[in-house]
């Protein structure tokens, strides 16, 4: 997956550390993109402790249902017949007051892994909870939404991790149809992986059209090509198709791809040395 735009460690770095069982006592996972927050917290919930250890050593609560003091009390408890204790606070943005947590962060219990999942935005870094967590050896992860232009790369990387490749046009078709909701996007990609419709481990536009319901003839790729080759009739045909079928997608989602093409065209046109090598 592409490196995320974070102020701290990337998703990939955090996952490598978790897989190597290099745990931090505090994780503050925050941001607009819930996908990476869920992936990290779910991994901690399912991999740190053995199934038989979780009943007495793992607590998963919601921010609206607990106080900061109750979270601290749970975090201060020592593990029973296990190496670690895990406390995960989902939707911690609903937590009222963090003073008790700030105090706990000054001297966190080494055997406890405390995870705060703050969704739908990031914590103001000027608030004491962030520097307090950092001083206590905590990991601060900020998960931001991917730009539209980054979605095809995300799709290619996700499928490659499952030993499947995808044609650029097919990746763009999916990105335009689904958008930047990574939970929904990965759900659609999982459908592709389960469909067994790939040809020699490769996803084609025909597969996307059949499995996801995206037209291989009416999409951003075809609109861009129609503009490039000055095929006014085809360009208007595609525009009219989406105007008459709003559920098929929005023309506005095509703009990043078209803009990028003309941006690159201008860069090439005004380059000082326009030759094949440059």
Q: Which residues does each PLM region occupy?
A:
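Conserved beta/loop motifs at nucleotide-recognition and modification sites
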Residues: 1-278
